[in-house]
């Protein structure tokens, strides 16, 4: 056991859920935060809190004086990028300010992404590096870090910012799970005797993307939270390799025993809606755990990823130079996730 006590905001998400597992495995005490009262799959204590409400946050956090580390992977959506800034900065500010006042806080780990490099706006400089200049315009990840780094100045605790690529996870029911969307699509294609057609444009087919396995991301995040080399630093965290879809997609098709077909723009959201009856029959026939495909994954994030008709990757060497060495072959990551989906009877 360690004396470290983690407070995880976003503990049920694609990043937070794996982070909880990793922390528990390392002997940490872990407390989760949630807007709604419910249980957590890992049976950790959950504190129900509305981080947008400063007074409610102060009351809810009052008993948590033993917290040593905050891991922040929560976020709230809005109509556009501009409207996402204020609520997301407010949530982080309320959590950090109140926790810092009542505890012996050591580190705040902020999960970000490549949006800080302008990845959401269109083609951007690749490989993206942590030293790249900021991008003009409203973006909540950058605004959060600007507030956090300013607030931390002169205080005894430290921050770090973690920037993964597309995260690979076995978590079901999360819209951000690209591997799961692909697995559902491939399962439908197999049942309908269709090839696995690439669902993006020719430009997307040729673009370079990097990925981050959820376990590697969790380990890197814990390393950064406990390493002096990571104090007040941002790190890109990726598997350590890069792929073009034109290389990776045929391997995925082969894993499912399917022919690979040329690119045609397809919407996963629309496809999953159209094939709800087909999935119900497939789930019944193979005794899958969920008969409603939209409850497994809605395809929204997959549509976002396959709309990228430009390169999307970062330089992960700063993390390795600082002392975190683990790497992961991305093709093996996908194959392992597909096996896990199958073992859990999410796909046939």
What are these regions (language model features)?
Residues 28-39:
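Conserved glycine-rich Rossmann-like NAD(P)H-binding loop of the short-chain dehydrogenase/reductase
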Residues 218-302, 315-317, 321, 338, ...:
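Mid/C-terminal beta-alpha module of Rossmann-like enzyme folds, strongest
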Residues 70-72, 82, 90-140, 160:
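Conserved Rossmann-fold NAD(P)-dependent oxidoreductase catalytic core, especially the SDR/UDP-sugar
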Residues 112, 147-176:
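Conserved beta-loop-beta element that borders a ligand/cofactor-binding pocket
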Residues 155, 167-185, 215, 223-235, ...:
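Glycine/proline-rich active-site loop of Rossmann-fold NAD(P)-dependent oxidoreductases
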Residues 38-42, 48-94:
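NAD(P)H-binding glycine-rich loop region in Rossmannoid oxidoreductase-like domains
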């Amino acid at each position: 056991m360690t004396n470290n006590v983690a407070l995880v905001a976003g503990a049920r998400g694609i990043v937070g859920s794996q982070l909880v597992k990793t922390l528990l495995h390392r002997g940490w005490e872990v407390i989760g935060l949630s807007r709604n009262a419910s249980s957590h799959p890992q049976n950790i204590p959950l504190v129900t809190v509305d981080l947008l409400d400063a007074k409610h946050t102060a009351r809810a956090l009052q008993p948590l004086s033993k917290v040593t580390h905050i891991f922040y992977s929560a976020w709230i959506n809005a109509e556009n990028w501009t409207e996402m800034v204020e609520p997301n900065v407010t949530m982080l500010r309320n959590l950090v300010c109140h926790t810092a006042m009542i505890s012996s806080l050591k580190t705040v780990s902020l999960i970000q992404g490549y949006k800080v490099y302008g990845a959401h706006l269109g083609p951007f400089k690749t490989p993206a590096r942590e030293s790249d200049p900021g991008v003009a315009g409203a973006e909540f990840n950058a605004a959060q870090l600007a507030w956090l780094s300013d607030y931390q100045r002169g205080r005894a605790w430290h921050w770090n910012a973690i920037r993964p690529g597309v995260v690979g996870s076995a978590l079901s029911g999360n819209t951000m799970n690209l591997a799961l969307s692909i697995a559902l699509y491939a399962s439908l294609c197999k049942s309908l005797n269709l090839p696995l057609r690439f669902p993006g444009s020719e430009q997307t087919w040729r673009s370079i993307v990097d990925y981050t396995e959820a376990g590697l991301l969790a380990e890197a995040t814990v390393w950064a939270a406990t390493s002096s080399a990571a104090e007040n630093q941002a790190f890109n965290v990726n598997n350590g390799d890069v792929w073009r879809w034109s290389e990776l997609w045929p391997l995925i098709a082969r894993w499912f025993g399917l022919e690979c077909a040329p690119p045609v723009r397809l919407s996963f959201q629309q496809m999953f809606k159209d094939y709800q009856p087909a999935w119900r029959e497939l789930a019944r026939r193979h005794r899958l755990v969920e008969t409603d495909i939209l409850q497994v994954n809605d395809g929204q994030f997959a549509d976002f990823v396959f709309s990228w008709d430009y390169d999307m990757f970062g330089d992960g060497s700063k993390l390795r130079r600082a002392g975190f060495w683990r790497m992961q072959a991305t093709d093996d990551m996908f194959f392992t996730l597909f096996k896990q989906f199958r073992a859990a009877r999410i796909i046939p």
